[in-house]
Amino acid sequence: MSAPDDLLRVSAERLLVAIRDILAEKSIVSPAEIADRIAITEAASPAQGGGIVARAWVDPLFRQRLLGDGTRAVEELGVVMRGAPPLGVVENDGSVHHLVVCTLCSCYPRAVLGYPPFWFKSASYRARAVRDPRGLLAEWGTIVPAGVKLRIVDSTADYRWMVLPRRPEGTDGWDEERLASIVTAGDMIGVTIPKIA
């Protein structure tokens, strides 16, 4: 890192500490609440989302609850949703394939998937997901057959979306851990589908 980069990093850290101190001083939020929120955010990851998908694949009752009220269902698995927008879950099947996009910015289900991939926030992805979704998916190697409806789901500041992908053929008898290992962030956004290695 260069000296200007170091200076910028130090300045940003000082600003962050100052904001945190002001929020605590005004009793808006305590340092413990800030630390708690940071821990929750850092615990979220695509692996956590993969575990949610795997549970839905092996437990039909959980799958029903997940599709009915995603927020409540993921909380059953220990995912902390406090302070996060509600979570909706849509299911890919033989007749419909869902693709999640935030057309305005980068609203992403961070509570279950962690930080968004860089491309999810890009203007190119956001525009093409709406204008040319089949072309966009083809670039990811995901071909949605002509007979399958492609539904674009707009994730917003008020409501976040996640895709429950189709379980791949040939995974009968797999346990949850093995199933979770094949699920990627792209699968839960709808740009890719789970593949058996």
Task: Identify the residue ranges that each predicted region occupies.
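Terminal, compositionally biased segments used for targeting/anchoring and flexible tails
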Residues: M1-A197
